């Protein structure tokens, strides 16, 4: 342990390059780390810690490692079950490690340098232990680097253990997920999520009733009970009603509306309507001038006059806009 503590002081002065990940191959673990540890027990590595697997449970190992997110590396000495035997003691207080499958040979070039054993941790005691998702790969020297070619002091048999936890899908679980497991139920608050409904003012379901502006016809049409609609054009009816009910019938504003409307068809409709009103106004002026010369009366009958006064009061009651231009003379428009 003195060596390990001394290494910790040296470790604080070492810097790793950006993006560094400790991801050695099986052959690199044997050649560059385990072989050096067996030759010199004081050897230490930046990314590999030292631990006694018989005194540590697998879920404690991630916090005992020097580094690693999904897998953790340790130097450890295999504990013999019997002093004179070769069987290894793999039991802990909570369970035991059980070997599974066949040992894998590790080569450097064409030379055998080590073996890899796969073990799974079981809770409880054999043979009724409960299998867990904790897995360990144990690396030992073999062949060219076997203990037979090493000094007798290396008989303690150092090994390197790689420990990780598998998920249900067979993937390794990172340590960050292990830390978050207990807090997932409390961190999530559905009330903090933004509303999925669109609060756009354009989605307002309120619709304005269409406004109809009646045309005042002659007495014959009134007797027939026919009511004409000046804006009976399909193009004009397709426009939102709330555009028109906000527009007073003043000359300045009507010109501004016609200029702001973007539809070419709508612009044509307004041009035709404006031309008809202007033509009617000219004919009315011509008729009035003729009547003054000939003495022909231009007075309207009582019914039309009453309708005219009623309509005029309705439009005169509107509030004048800020423009200095007065309201349009609607008399020719009503007579059309």
Curated annotation (Swiss-Prot):
InterPro entries: NAC-dom, NAC_dom_sf
DNA-binding region: 113-172
Domain NAC: 16-166
Zinc recorded as keyword: no
Gene Ontology molecular function: any one: DNA binding
Keyword set, alphabetical order: DNA-binding, Nucleus, Transcription, Transcription regulation
Ranges for region Disordered: 313-336
Membrane-spanning segments: none
GO cellular component: nucleus
UniProt keyword Transcription present: yes
Induction text: Repressed by the microRNA miR164.
Pfam families: NAM
Location relative to the cell: Nucleus
Record comment regarding domains: The NAC domain includes a DNA-binding domain and a dimerization domain.
Job of this protein: Binds to the promoter regions of genes involved in chlorophyll catabolic processes, such as NYC1, SGR1, SGR2 and PAO.
Record's protein name: NAC domain-containing protein 100
């Amino acid at each position: 342990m003195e060596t390990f503590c001394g290494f910790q002081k040296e470790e604080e002065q070492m810097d790793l390059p950006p993006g560094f990940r400790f991801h050695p191959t099986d052959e690199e673990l044997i050649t560059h780390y385990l072989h050096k540890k067996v030759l010199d027990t004081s050897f230490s590595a930046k990314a590999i810690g030292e631990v006694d697997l018989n005194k540590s449970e697998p879920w404690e190992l991630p916090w005992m490692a020097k580094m690693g997110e999904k897998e953790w590396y340790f130097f450890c000495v295999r504990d013999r079950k019997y002093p004179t035997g070769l069987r290894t003691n793999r039991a802990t207080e909570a369970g035991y490690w059980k070997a599974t499958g066949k040992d894998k040979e590790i080569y450097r070039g064409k030379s055998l340098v080590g073996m890899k054993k796969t073990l799974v941790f079981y809770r409880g005691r054999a043979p009724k232990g409960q299998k867990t998702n904790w897995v360990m790969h144990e690396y030992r020297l073999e062949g060219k680097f076997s203990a037979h070619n090493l000094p007798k002091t290396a008989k303690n048999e150092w090994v390197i253990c790689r420990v990780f936890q598998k998920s249900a899908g067979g993937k390794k679980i990172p340590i960050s997920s292990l830390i978050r497991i207990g807090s997932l139920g409390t961190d999530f608050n559905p009330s903090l999520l933004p509303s999925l409904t669109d609060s756009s003012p354009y989605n307002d379901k309120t619709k304005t009733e269409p406004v109809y502006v009646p045309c005042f016809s002659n007495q014959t049409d009134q007797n027939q009970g026919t009511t004409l609609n000046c804006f009976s054009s399909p193009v004009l009816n397709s426009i939102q009603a709330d555009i028109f009910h906000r527009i007073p019938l003043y000359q300045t504003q009507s010109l501004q509306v016609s200029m702001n409307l973007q539809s070419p068809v709508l612009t044509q409709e307004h041009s035709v309507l404006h031309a008809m009103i202007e033509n009617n106004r000219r004919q009315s002026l011509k008729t009035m001038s003729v009547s003054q010369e000939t003495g022909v009366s231009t007075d309207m009958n009582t019914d039309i006059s009453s309708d005219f006064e009623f309509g005029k009061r309705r439009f005169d009651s509107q509030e004048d806009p800020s423009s200095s231009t007065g309201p349009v003379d609607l008399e020719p428009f009503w007579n059309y």
